[in-house]
Swiss-Prot record:
Pathway: Carbohydrate metabolism; tricarboxylic acid cycle; isocitrate from oxaloacetate: step 1/2. One of its GO terms (cellular component) is cytoplasm. The active site is at H304, D363. GO terms for molecular function: citrate (Si)-synthase activity. The lineage of its organism: Bacteria, Pseudomonadati, Pseudomonadota, Alphaproteobacteria, Rickettsiales. It comes from the Bacteria. It catalyses: oxaloacetate + acetyl-CoA + H2O = citrate + CoA + H(+). The keyword Methyltransferase does not apply. Its EC number is 2.3.3.16. This is Citrate synthase.
Length: 411
């Protein structure tokens, strides 16, 4: 039998359907409130509002659980590769060997970008931020695929594959242009993660040998950042897509949202904070500053909008960080890691942080890994965008396949 919640407004009672979730909290359907009760609901930041039904990602923030299509994120990070997870998010199931081989072949086939796109890069000054270049380049893809501006259902999968394939190429080109080096073309003999590292660090006169530990770490980072429910950038992609805008335009809006320091730029802020702390001896002083309401200092990398427990992605990255630094001979002498480990240990025992449920999040260790890999801080958010493009495309595809989909129009 259907369940209802009762809402009393000005003496009149309205029955609101309670929608049963397949997992997690049930939802009160308020879609008819404005029409029947002559008033709106108010929820700044959509803290308590579900904007859509989705079967892609599930989070239980109190228990520190993150699942994609029912699979635990830790299992995916340790047992899958990024394109296998991409297939899972887009199609809803893990691929067979044949499906996986076909999918990876298609991604490799579409990794090249049109040569004319090179001219777009020349319009930027050499000091341009790679995210600014990437934002423009991704949006410009609309001009190269005019036949896909009016999407049909058959185009969803091809568009997703094209986007997943071309984003790493554009990302690497953005980096190469920012440092004045020639663009490096994709190499289809390499897998997805190896290919990106190749395009980032090879030159026409020097080959780049991919370290398997580095490759494995980056693969995990990509998986851990692939999707995360209706966050700011994903919601932005869905809102843009709800108007019928093409996927290239939608993804560029997601990149713009991700660029914000409160969203995709947090791991860079963690690195800056660890540098500011400087040494383990200074940690108590900065802990005190974080507790002081009148002090503008914030302890970056702690706390999360959703998680009120240890971020499961952070747990994987902590061990990944140690593995990378051990491989590079930095495990015992990397000052940022030592400060991070001691800062975490102190904070997790402090009543101030325990009461507020402030635990390390995914950004706390990822920046240290990137720095050890030789990836500059201005590229951190770019790598986030590479990974999250998979989630954006899965969400974009799901939105278009939803019979209840409407153009987004907050009041």
């Amino acid at each position: 039998d259907s369940e209802f919640a009762e809402l009393k407004i000005r003496g009149k009672i309205f029955k609101l359907p309670i929608l049963k979730a397949s997992i997690g909290e049930d939802v009160i359907d308020i879609s008819r409130v404005s029409a029947e009760a002559d008033c709106f609901t108010y929820d700044p930041g959509f803290m308590s509002t579900a904007s859509c039904q989705s079967t892609i990602t599930y989070i239980d923030g109190d228990k520190g659980i993150l699942r994609h299509r029912g699979y635990n994120i830790k299992d995916l990070a340790e047992k899958s590769d990024f394109l296998e997870v991409a297939y899972l998010l887009i199609y809803g199931e893990l691929p067979t060997i044949e499906q996986y081989n076909n999918f990876t072949t298609q991604v490799a086939h579409h990794s090249l970008v049109n040569e004319r796109l090179h001219y777009l890069f020349q319009a930027f000054c050499s000091s341009s931020h790679p995210m600014a270049i990437m934002l423009a380049a991704v949006g410009s893809l609309s001009a190269f695929y005019p036949d896909l501006l009016n999407f049909k259902e058959a185009d969803y999968e091809l568009t997703a594959i094209r986007m997943i394939a071309k984003i790493p190429t554009i990302a690497a080109m953005s980096y190469k242009y920012s440092i004045g080096q020639p663009f490096i073309y994709p190499d289809n003999s390499l897998d997805f993660t190896e290919n990106f590292l190749h395009m980032m660090f090879a030159t026409p006169c020097t080959k780049y040998k991919v370290n398997p530990i580095i490759k494995n770490a980056l693969n995990k980072i990509f998986i851990l950042h692939a999707d995360h429910e209706q966050n700011a950038s994903t919601s932005t992609v869905r809102i843009a897509g709800s108007s019928g805008a093409n996927a290239f335009a939608c993804i560029s809006t997601g990149i713009a949202s991700l660029w914000g320091p409160a969203h995709g730029g947090a791991n860079e802020a963690v690195i800056n904070m660890l540098k500011e702390i400087g040494s383990s001896e200074n940690i108590p002083k900065f802990i005190a500053k974080a507790k002081d309401k009148n002090d503008p200092f914030r302890l970056m990398g702690f706390g999360h909008r959703v998680y009120k427990n240890y971020d499961p992605r952070a747990a994987v990255l902590k061990e990944t960080c140690k593995a990378v630094l051990k491989e590079l001979g930095q495990l015992e002498n990397n000052p940022l890691l030592q400060i991070a480990i001691e800062l975490e240990a102190i904070a997790l025992k402090d009543e101030y942080f325990i009461e507020r449920k402030l635990y390390p999040n995914v950004d706390f260790y990822s920046g240290i890994i990137y720095k050890a890999m030789g990836i500059p801080s201005q590229m951190f958010t770019v790598l986030f965008a590479i990974a999250r493009t998979v989630g954006w495309m899965a969400q974009w595809k799901e939105m278009h396949e939803d019979p209840e989909q409407k153009i987004s129009r907050p009041r």
